C-alpha cells in the first residue's frame, strides 16, 4: 500500500495536517472487520462524510474513496481480554456506565452486599456489624432530600412499567430524560408521580418507534387511561415534544410474533399497510385496528389463517373494528380474499 503525505489547505481548522494513504474500498467490505462511523471528519479527497474507524487495522478510512485519514491509532480499550461475561465482570475495574434511569445517574458509591474484602476473603465477624452500619448509612445519603426521593421513586416506577411491557433499554433512557425534563420545569406539581412516569414512557415509546397503546400502559401502571393521555398531552406541549402519528406498520412485528405467524405474513401485512397509507386509508383511524386487519388479511392470503377473535385479543381491539377495517382495505385495495 502506497503512503503519501498530503497537506489539507482548505479546511475549517487551519494549520491542521492529515496524513493520507490510499486503500482499496473493497478491503472494507469484509463483514468480519469491526467498523465504527466517524461523524465529525470529512474526507479531504472526495468530501464524503462516510468516515469509518477500523479497529482491526487501527486506521480511520473514507468509505467512499478508500483514503486513509489516520493510521496507527491507539487502542483505548482495556488491556485485558475476557472470553465470557463472568471473566468480564471479574476483570473490570470500573463500575457501570452513567444512566438516566437512576436518580444519581449511577455515579454514587455503592457498598457491595457480599461480606468480602478486595481479595475475595471473608470479612471477620467483628467487622461485619461495622460494615452493615456503613452500608445502611450509604443507602441513606444517596437520597438526601425530598426531591431526590421523589425522583428515585418515579424512576423505579418507570423501570417497573418498562419491565412488564418488555421495553428495550433505549426507551427507558428516553423516558427517564423526559421525566427529568418535566421535573426541571415544575410540571409534576398537582399531578401523580405514577401518571407522569407513565406518560413519559408512552412518549418515549412513540419517539423510539416501539409503540405501546395507552391501554397497555394503563394496565400495568395502576393509572387510569384518561389520566395518562391527559398528562401526555400536557408534558408534550410544555416540553415541546413533536411526534408524528403512530404508524400502523410499527405494530405489525409485535402482533405477528404474539400470533406466531411466519415472516411471509408479516411482510405481506406491511405491504398492505404501505399501499393503504398511499391511498390515505390509515389516516383518522386507530393504528392498532388497521394493523390488526392487515395481519388478518395477510394470514388468510398466506394460508396461515388466524381467527378475528385471536387477532383482536392480541391487538386489544374488538372484532367489529377488525371487520370494518377489513372491509375498507379489501374494497379499496382490490384484494380478493377467499374465506
Curated annotation (Swiss-Prot):
Zinc finger (TFIIB-type): 39-70
Binding site for Zn(2+): 43, 46, 62, 65
GO biological process: transcription preinitiation complex assembly
GO cellular component: transcription preinitiation complex
Residue ranges of Sequence repeats: 156-239, 250-331
Xref: InterPro entries: Cyclin-like_dom, Cyclin-like_sf, TFIIB, TFIIB_arc, TFIIB_CS, TFIIB_cyclin, Znf_TFIIB
CDD domains per record: CYCLIN_TFIIB_archaea_like_rpt1, CYCLIN_TFIIB_archaea_like_rpt2
Keywords: Metal-binding, Repeat, Transcription, Transcription regulation, Zinc, Zinc-finger
A GO MF term: DNA-binding transcription factor activity
One Pfam family here: TFIIB
Similarity-based family: Belongs to the TFIIB family.
Job description of the protein: Stabilizes TBP binding to an archaeal box-A promoter. Also responsible for recruiting RNA polymerase II to the pre-initiation complex (DNA-TBP-TFIIB).
Database matches in HAMAP family: TF2B_arch
Protein name from the UniProt record: Transcription initiation factor IIB
Gene from which the chain derives: tfb
Amino acid at each position: 500500500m502506497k503512503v503519501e503525505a498530503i497537506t489539507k489547505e482548505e479546511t475549517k481548522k487551519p494549520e491542521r495536517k492529515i496524513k493520507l494513504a490510499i486503500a482499496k474500498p473493497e478491503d472494507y467490505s469484509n463483514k468480519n472487520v469491526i467498523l465504527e462511523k466517524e461523524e465529525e471528519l470529512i474526507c479531504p479527497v472526495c468530501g464524503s462524510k462516510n468516515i469509518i474507524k477500523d479497529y482491526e487495522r487501527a486506521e480511520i478510512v473514507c468509505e467512499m474513496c478508500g483514503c486513509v485519514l489516520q493510521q496507527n491509532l491507539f487502542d483505548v480499550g482495556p488491556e485485558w481480554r475476557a472470553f465470557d461475561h463472568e471473566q468480564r465482570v471479574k476483570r473490570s475495574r470500573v463500575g457501570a456506565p452513567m444512566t438516566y434511569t437512576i436518580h444519581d445517574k449511577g455515579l454514587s458509591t455503592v457498598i457491595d452486599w457480599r461480606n468480602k474484602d478486595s481479595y475475595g476473603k471473608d470479612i471477620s465477624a467483628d467487622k461485619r456489624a461495622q460494615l452493615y452500619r456503613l452500608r445502611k448509612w450509604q443507602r441513606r445519603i444517596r437520597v438526601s432530600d425530598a426531591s431526590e426521593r421523589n425522583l428515585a421513586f418515579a424512576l423505579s416506577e418507570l423501570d417497573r412499567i418498562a419491565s412488564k411491557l418488555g421495553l428495550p433499554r433505549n426507551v427507558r433512557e428516553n423516558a427517564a430524560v423526559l421525566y427529568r425534563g418535566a421535573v426541571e420545569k415544575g410540571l409534576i406539581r398537582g399531578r401523580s408521580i405514577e401518571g407522569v412516569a407513565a406518560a413519559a414512557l408512552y412518549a418515549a415509546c412513540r419517539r423510539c418507534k416501539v409503540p405501546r397503546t395507552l391501554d397497555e400502559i394503563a394496565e400495568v401502571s395502576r393509572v387510569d387511561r384518561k389520566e395518562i393521555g391527559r398528562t401526555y398531552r400536557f408534558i408534550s406541549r410544555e416540553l415541546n415534544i413533536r411526534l408524528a402519528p403512530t404508524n400502523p406498520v410499527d405494530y405489525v412485528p409485535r402482533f405477528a410474533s404474539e400470533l406466531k405467524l411466519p415472516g411471509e405474513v408479516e411482510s405481506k401485512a406491511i405491504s398492505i399497510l404501505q399501499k393503504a397509507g398511499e391511498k390515505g386509508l390509515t389516516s383518522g383511524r386507530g393504528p392498532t385496528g388497521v394493523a390488526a386487519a392487515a395481519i388478518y388479511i395477510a394470514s388468510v392470503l398466506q394460508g396461515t389463517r388466524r381467527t378475528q377473535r385471536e387477532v383482536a385479543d392480541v391487538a386489544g381491539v374488538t372484532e367489529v373494528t377488525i371487520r370494518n377495517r377489513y372491509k375498507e382495505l379489501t374494497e379499496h385495495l382490490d384484494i380478493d380474499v377467499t374465506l
